Design a protein with these regions (language model features):
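Bacterial N-terminal signal peptides that target proteins for export
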Residues: 1-9
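Bacterial N-terminal signal peptides
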Residues: 9-18
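Active-site neighborhoods and metal-handling regions in enzymes and metal-associated proteins
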Residues: 2, 20-483
Length: 483
């Protein structure tokens, strides 16, 4: 072996200690290529035609020292994570221009580099856009002084609320409705304000909604997107399994949240894909119970629905299990029914079929399953039979948001669709609610259950609970009972 001189050792040490070696380029993503973003923008050009433009707002900057998260659709089209950014797509010449704020040197010194108008050459290399300009030039470009001669007649912009974190569009729309009905608030949405500004400043444009087109694009996931969702699902599943291991009577709901969060951050998540739902006993009856303040009781079930925000994508996995590690007879009857229903739904998912066809075929199978079955109480029998008519077992798309944009119900399924299968039953008189949730990927030949590795069979669930979890290794100040 050749002798390594002290000079080479010193040179290597200086190299690994240098900022260029030690730090990754945190200011730009590494999952998608220039061609990925260009292909997405090309679909918009194709759709809007040559007598229209599209303007897409990025997310606003955040107050305080908070990690910025771009709005989903802006990230989808550019990969840029700078606040107050705008993208102009000119259908006349199929050119794309990014408008960015000027550099804030003081903030960069304190927080690290953020792409700005001064980085125009770098941004073009990273994103593949044709031009990068400072934000103040957007108005001049919209009146036709430079990019648009003569001015385009139609301006497309997203009018649906953009997701920027743990909230999905359905939740944002509900929040907007509550704000609008508040006589002391009533503020319009950011999208509505933007539309109003365009109307007042540039009345020559007919404004149309770009959201439906973006929704249809995001509905069908590329192979790269699928791999990120797969990783998000793996992290979600490992987090739930860690919570299973940490479960015993006396453990608090929030402690299961902590166990899962540790796994999330350990594996590169930047936060929650949505607020965790962790409910023991009757708390599980509330579909989006988020308080997580109660101790788990012996004899109860605990439901956990949780997934991370991983590289701008998430997942949606739910499991329910016995706090004491063993299903009792009544719990077992209902739980086995739900698992069988999940399997029946997956059996019929494939390209070309609709959600209603899947639901009808699975319900027919479950009616056969129920022949000769008896349950501990008549109310249980009634619940499972009535549940066969419920259409919500086939749920929602999953992707950049947990309740992602696009439609999977009422349309033929296509390869690349990712959505949840979520069989559930309610026993009202006991406030007993049981469900599990898995992530389905439609493939060319059928379907893949992306969360199949997360224990759902009774013996697998009970075996996992017996294993030691984080709470047993790191006992919290509010120490739970020992296993």
């Amino acid at each position: 072996m050749k002798k390594v001189t002290s000079t080479w050792i010193l040179a290597f040490c200086l190299l690994i200690l240098s900022p260029a070696f030690a730090q990754e380029k945190h200011y730009f993503q590494k999952d998608f290529s220039i061609s990925d973003f260009a292909e997405r923008r090309a679909k918009i050009f194709d759709a809007i035609g040559n007598n229209a433009i599209a303007v897409i707002q990025g997310a606003s900057g955040l107050a305080g020292f908070t990690v910025f998260r771009q709005s989903n659709s802006f990230y989808y089209l550019t990969g840029v994570e700078s606040g107050h950014a705008y993208l102009l797509l000119n259908g006349k010449n199929r050119k794309s221009t990014l408008y960015l704020p000027h550099r804030d040197a003081g903030r960069e010194n304190g927080e690290g580099k953020v792409l700005s108008a001064e980085d125009a050459e770098l941004v073009i290399q990273l994103t593949g856009v044709n031009q990068v300009r400072a934000l103040e030039y957007l108005s001049a470009n919209l009146v036709g002084a430079e990019l648009l001669q003569p001015p385009a007649l139609t301006l497309y912009t997203p009018l649906s609320p953009e997701e920027t974190g743990t909230d999905s569009r359905d939740e944002l729309l509900s929040a907007q409705a509550r704000t609008a009905s508040d006589p002391w608030d009533g503020q319009p949405s950011r999208e509505a304000r933007f539309k109003r500004l365009i109307n007042s400043r540039f009345p020559q444009f007919e404004i149309r909604d770009l959201s439906p087109l973006l929704d249809s694009m995001r509905l069908i996931k590329s192979q790269k997107e699928i791999e990120i969702i797969r990783k998000a699902t793996q992290i979600a599943g490992e987090g739930i399994m860690e919570a299973m291991r940490s479960t015993s009577p006396g453990v608090y709901e929030y402690q299961l949240d902590a166990a899962a969060k540790y796994i999330f951050y350990l594996n590169g998540a930047r936060g929650d894909g949505y607020a965790s739902i962790i409910g023991g006993g009757k708390n599980a009856w509330m579909g989006h119970y988020f308080h997580k303040t109660d101790a788990l009781a012996d004899g109860d079930l605990v439901l956990m629905d949780y997934a991370p925000d991983y590289r701008y994508y998430t997942s949606d996995v739910t499991r329910i299990w016995p706090v004491n590690g063993k299903f009792d007879k009544a719990q077992l009857e209902l739980y086995n029914y739900i698992v069988a229903y999940r399997d029946a739904l997956f059996k019929y998912i494939k390209p070309g079929v609709t959600a209603n066809e899947v639901l009808d075929q699975a319900a027919a199978d479950m009616k056969k399953y129920l022949v000769g079955k008896t349950f501990a109480k008549p109310s249980y029998q009634k619940a499972v039979e009535e549940g066969l008519a419920f259409r919500g077992h086939f749920q929602h798309p999953v992707g950049m948001a947990v309740h992602d944009v696009g439609r999977v119900r009422g349309v033929p399924l296509q390869p690349g669709m990712v959505f949840t299968i979520d069989p559930m039953i309610w026993i009202p008189d006991e406030k007993l609610y049981i469900r599990i949730e898995d992530v389905a990927l439609v493939t060319a030949s059928g379907v893949e259950n992306m969360s199949a590795f997360v224990p759902s069979k009774v013996e697998d669930v009970e075996r996992t609970i017996k294993e030691s979890g984080l709470i047993q290794f790191r006992v919290p100040l509010t120490a739970p009972a020992k296993k």
